[in-house]
Amino acid sequence: MSDASRVAVVTGATSGIGKATVQALRGKGLTVYAVGRNEEALSELATTCGAKTIRADVRDTAAIVAVLNGVEVDILVNNAGILSTRAVFQDIDPAEIDAMIDVNLKAPMHLTRALLPGMVARRRGHLIFIGSIGGQSAFPNSSAYGASKAGLSLFCDNLRLDLLGSSVRVSEIVPGRVETSLYRTSIPDNQASAVLYDGYRSLQPENIARVIENVIDLPVFVDVARVEVYPTDQASGGGTMVKFQA
């Protein structure tokens, strides 16, 4: 299929990896539906790159699917995710546990379930999931987040088994440290930059969008099951990162 005939849906589209992915795919000529809650940011995407927008909480599958009624979706980028708190597990508010499981695991499962039958019937489609090294390795103060991302990773593995022979591809992109707003909600007093980014060469959202572009452009019989992406200053597994020495 030509890029102009392909249709993509990107969740968490108003910032970070999601926004960069929308811009990259629109730059290739795809029709892109950007899903997010921030009306102003969605309007900006519509104006600057011509994305179609769906203002909805990613947990509201019905609202998203209603807009996509009759649309033949070729690519679903399940990007939306939250790290709402960083604390030892015994101190986490139970509501925070529910939120991370709902957004990071249940929402992509439900949206995938809604769009997948059409892909299977058409014998084409690509499901992209933005995972996390936090779902591959243990990190302190990340029990609920890590569990949600580990569950997502195993879901991808099982989904591939369910889809064998269907020509529908499943790819999990597992980034290392990316400079996005994810941590800014969980690190207090606007300390995220000082703690995580100052002096480090972190990945940028555009780097991950480039990986997604490369994965979807491979021949349709080639399925990149999982790819881990790190800055050169971060060790595999993500637990060790050094500051850049010029």
Give the label of every model feature segment.
Residues 87-89, 93-101:
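Substrate-binding pocket helix/loop in short-chain dehydrogenase/reductase
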